[in-house]
Amino acid sequence: MGNLTSAQPAGCKIVETLPATLPLALPAGSMLTYDCFDTLISQTQSELCIASYCCNLRSTPEGGHVLLRLLELARANVRVTIIVDEQSRDADATQLAGVPNLRYLKMDVGELPGGKPGSLLSSFWVSDKRRFYLGSASLTGGSISTIKSLGVYSECAPLARDLRRRFRDYERLCARRCLRCLSLSTRFHLRRRCGDAFFSDAPESLIGSTRTFDADAVLAHVQAARSTIDMELLSLVPLVRDEDSVKYWPRMHDALVRAALERNVRLRLLVGLWHRSDVFSLAAVKGLHELGVGHADISVRVFAIPGAKGDAINNTKLLVVDDEYVHVSNADIDGTHYARHAFVSFNCAERTFARALGALFERDWQSSFSSPLPRALPPEPATLLSVN
């Protein structure tokens, strides 16, 4: 794609939450989410920044321990700032209130231009502008212990500083400052990467002139796919929903279909199944699955956690293209997510890391917790009528 790349390696590690009910093997050299968060707290010396939809750590013992570690860190004269969505419940607010050096802020995505309601979906940590975590594990006890989650840990300081810029913009939005006060800057993007890695953002009102819109990052690689596209996610919804309208959003759906039908790319989708599965997502992936006939190599499987209760789901959000490019996020392929919600995703074209995440997808795809969607029965051959 004609990219410029800085010499700094991203040095990424896979981070996962694997519930006890999922006896899956953790990839070699990877970290558990609990250990990753604990490590970030231990390594921080001056500043720890955390963005998450909500803060509900006390819902599990492991989460409660992380909360205690954060409180201890703040009391040790380290600045801790937690930003959550304006609409989220203040489950841990009482414990966080009045702690020296700790700020608990709320961000209203509806303050962005256009005034459309939205949510903060970002889930990332930045420690001392030197190391970071980004993935699908929110600041909740479930994300640490009972919800299958995927993220990335890196000690690449240039990328950590770049992610800290996003956090600074979030802080200013919490202070209800105008958009002109936001820098919306970045050193790295789709055309200029750091160690083959960069961040992409949504919605478009948080892009500015240099950041990469997340949908554009995903589409660029889907449209360039040569052999394989593997996706693991909770939903694929080709719609943008407003309070009073629904609009069709075909960009991603069409790109996937074209890759399979026009370029013979193998497409595999592994979709998390739970009691809140989006009906439009199920319809969309079933439609893709039914296109897997003839030369079109398209298949869809669903991943269900046995005995799952409440929000115990497969919340892994992963895209692997040609075992050469990976995209890790906390957002689904959903038109409303791109149009209304605020999030940051991690993109990487380092082959060793891409292959490791490709192997993780293969593990999940082949596991006993994954089952194929049944295809519709083919129609009976039409009876040929002779015309006399």
From Swiss-Prot:
<dbReference type="Pfam" id="PF13918">
    <property type="entry name" value="PLDc_3"/>
</dbReference>
<keyword id="KW-1043">Host membrane</keyword>
<keyword id="KW-0426">Late protein</keyword>
<feature type="lipid moiety-binding region" description="N-myristoyl glycine; by host">
    <location>
        <position position="2"/>
    </location>
</feature>
<keyword id="KW-0519">Myristate</keyword>
<dbReference type="GO" id="GO:0016020">
    <property type="term" value="C:membrane"/>
</dbReference>
<dbReference type="GO" id="GO:0055036">
    <property type="term" value="C:virion membrane"/>
</dbReference>
<keyword id="KW-0261">Viral envelope protein</keyword>
<keyword id="KW-1038">Host endoplasmic reticulum</keyword>
<dbReference type="InterPro" id="IPR001736">
    <property type="entry name" value="PLipase_D/transphosphatidylase"/>
</dbReference>
<dbReference type="GO" id="GO:0044167">
    <property type="term" value="C:host cell endoplasmic reticulum membrane"/>
</dbReference>
<feature type="domain" description="PLD phosphodiesterase">
    <location>
        <begin position="310"/>
        <end position="337"/>
    </location>
</feature>
<dbReference type="GO" id="GO:0019031">
    <property type="term" value="C:viral envelope"/>
</dbReference>
<dbReference type="Pfam" id="PF00614">
    <property type="entry name" value="PLDc"/>
</dbReference>
<keyword id="KW-0449">Lipoprotein</keyword>
<dbReference type="InterPro" id="IPR050874">
    <property type="entry name" value="Diverse_PLD-related"/>
</dbReference>
<dbReference type="GO" id="GO:0003824">
    <property type="term" value="F:catalytic activity"/>
</dbReference>
<keyword id="KW-0946">Virion</keyword>
<keyword id="KW-0472">Membrane</keyword>
<dbReference type="InterPro" id="IPR032803">
    <property type="entry name" value="PLDc_3"/>
</dbReference>
<protein>
    <recommendedName>
        <fullName>Envelope protein F13 homolog</fullName>
    </recommendedName>
</protein>
<comment type="function">
    <text>Envelope protein associated with the inner side of the enveloped virion (EV) membrane.</text>
</comment>
